[in-house]
Design a protein with these regions (language model features):
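Acyl-donor-binding surface of acyltransferase catalytic domains
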Residues: 1-43, 166-168
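Residue-level recognition of the GNAT/N-acetyltransferase active site
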Residues: 6, 109, 113, 142
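Conserved GNAT acetyl-CoA-binding A-motif
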Residues: 1-7, 130-140
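Flexible, substrate/cofactor-facing loop regions flanked by secondary structure
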Residues: 40-110
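Conserved active-site alpha-helix within GNAT-family acetyltransferase domains
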Residues: 7-25, 119, 143-161
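Short acidic/polar active-site loop segments enriched in Thr and Asp
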Residues: 1, 22, 99, 135, ...
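Conserved acetyl-CoA-binding loop-helix of GNAT-fold acetyltransferases
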Residues: 105-108, 114-131, 150-154
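C-terminal, charge/polar-rich interaction regions
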Residues: 93-101, 118, 140-144, 148
Length: 168
């Protein structure tokens, strides 16, 4: 059984320790300001495809609960751009929330990981979101997902909240 509590909540952490629950992992909420004039890495194609709520996929039903969902896709410029719509090398989902946008399910094809494609994709995506009027972007990531943590730190995200999970 798992319990969760805010990392700052010392009284809950003491109670969980008293019953023998052990810290298992943390989930972080990360955020980053969006800047229109930000430098974009060359060599990447990025497109945001707006999706109507009735076209939601199973992957994004739980996140948006009826709101608009966007799908962002990317590929290296040396690839066939029209093919990127059916076989993108990088994908993510975006859920607009007022002046912020929530990013989730960022994926790079396994055979292309550790080649800076995620960094290049975010460098192209983030200014596009700023041009759409968004002020910040938010996401959630597990402390166990070290490659994702490194990517987000490298691209300017910072931790705004920590939720700790304890196993009992």
């Amino acid at each position: 059984m798992y319990f969760s509590c805010s990392a700052e909540n010392e009284s809950w952490k003491n109670i969980l320790g008293h019953i023998g629950a052990e810290h298992a992992w943390d989930e972080y909420m990360l955020e980053r300001k969006l800047i229109i004039s930000e430098k974009t890495e060359a060599g990447i194609y990025c497109r945001i495809v707006e999706t109507a709520p009735e076209n939601k996929t199973e992957a994004n039903d739980t996140i948006t609960s009826g709101n608009i969902v966007w799908h962002a896709i990317g590929c290296r410029l040396n690839q066939n751009i029209p093919l990127s719509f059916t076989s993108p090398e990088v994908t993510c989902f975006l859920a607009p929330q007022g002046e912020s946008v929530y990013l989730y399910s960022l994926q790079v094809l396994p055979e292309l990981r550790n080649r800076h494609l995620g960094t290049a994709f975010l460098s192209a995506l983030l200014p596009r979101l700023a041009k759409k009027g968004f002020k910040s972007i938010k996401l959630q990531v597990s402390s166990k997902n070290l490659p994702a943590m490194a990517l987000y730190k490298k691209t300017g995200f910072y931790i705004t909240q920590t939720l700790s999970f304890y196993e009992y």
